[in-house]
């Protein structure tokens, strides 16, 4: 059985990200940490509602299996 490898996200730590999540949710924030299952810790997180409203939700942990897409908003 192959061993799980951690995601290559170390160079993106402390950079701003946009994440598309299952359930049609979209959040933006700063990547503070991650684990081999791609669970992410996002700081200064803002939820972007489909109506255009933004809601500050602070520091959150996002499970890796709920992430559909992630995009770095800053150059590495």
From Swiss-Prot:
GO terms for molecular function: RNA binding. InterPro entries: Lsm7/SmG-like, LSM_dom_sf, Sm, Sm_dom_euk/arc, Sm_G. One of its GO terms (cellular component) is P granule. The keyword Ribonucleoprotein applies. Residues 4-76 form the Sm domain. Pfam families: LSM. It is found in: Nucleus. GO terms for biological process: mRNA splicing, via spliceosome. Signal peptide: none annotated. Transmembrane segments: none annotated. Keywords: mRNA processing, mRNA splicing, Nucleus, Ribonucleoprotein, RNA-binding, Spliceosome. Its main location: nucleus. SMART domains: Sm. Coiled coil: none annotated. Gene3D superfamilies: 2.30.30.100. PANTHER family: SMALL NUCLEAR RIBONUCLEOPROTEIN, SMALL NUCLEAR RIBONUCLEOPROTEIN G-RELATED. Associated with snRNP U1, U2, U4/U6 and U5. Belongs to the snRNP Sm proteins family. This is Putative small nuclear ribonucleoprotein G-like protein 15. The gene is SNRPGP15.
């Amino acid at each position: 059985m192959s061993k799980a490898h951690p995601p290559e996200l170390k160079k993106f730590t402390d950079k701003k990200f946009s994440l598309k999540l299952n359930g049609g949710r979209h959040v933006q924030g700063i990547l503070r940490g991650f684990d081999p299952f791609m669970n992410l810790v996002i700081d200064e997180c803002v939820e972007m509602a489909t109506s255009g409203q933004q809601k500050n939700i602070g520091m959150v942990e996002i499970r890796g299996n709920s992430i559909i897409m992630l995009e770095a908003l800053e150059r590495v």
